Amino acid sequence: MISISQNNQSFWIHADQVKPSKQADYEQVAKDFIEACTKYNLKDSDWSTARIDDGTYLTITPISNMADLDKNTLAPLFEKMGEEKFRSIFKRFNECYDKHGDYIVTLNSDLSYMPNGLTLNTEGQNYRKWHFLYVTPSNSQALREKIKAIKDLYAKKGAKEYFRIYHSGFGTMGEYYLAVISAKDEQSYAKLGDENEALLGDEGKKLFAEMFSLLDKYESKTGVMRPDLGYTAKQ
């Protein structure tokens, strides 16, 4: 479970683009790795895992600042497991993909709409819809203001569709804002979306049209959170 320790919490994202034939193997080695972390009581490491429908797995780790990237939090695990066992796990990981990478995103509390409290832990709502709003530098501030106007309309109307807004950072090519919506499943997401569109009415349609006119590119992705592939250190 990831807690939000500050207003604009940053996250280190590690993405593994897993081969279609290797996804079961990848999940098994991920579970074996978590079992080792639990067995040896690895400290100072917490991450959540999401799976995008295209087979990309995201390991999501909260960080306080860029200096956190220099910390080798796995060093105690290496020492307790021994080099051979430790390296064998990551060798198994590497056999599951040809491409992987890292980047930073920051959760923006001012733009996110969760009236009952900003949290990533949406229990019973592991379905995810990611809306990527790519923008050029010349339109970045205008897009931010438009997202804020949409949030304000949601609040005024008492919308039941909640969203979190992230902003791209270090390690990404181009700039984007990312709206993340949680739901029980795809059907629940679609139903809530239809209800929300009706609630916001013409005012909502106008704001979204104005927002889309500012974008350089838009894309959406679907997937699920995988609590069984995440890890929380014991306190």
Regions found by a protein language model. Give the residues of each.
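Short S/T/G/P-rich N-terminal loop/turn motif that feeds into the first structured element of a domain
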Residues: 2-205, 209-235
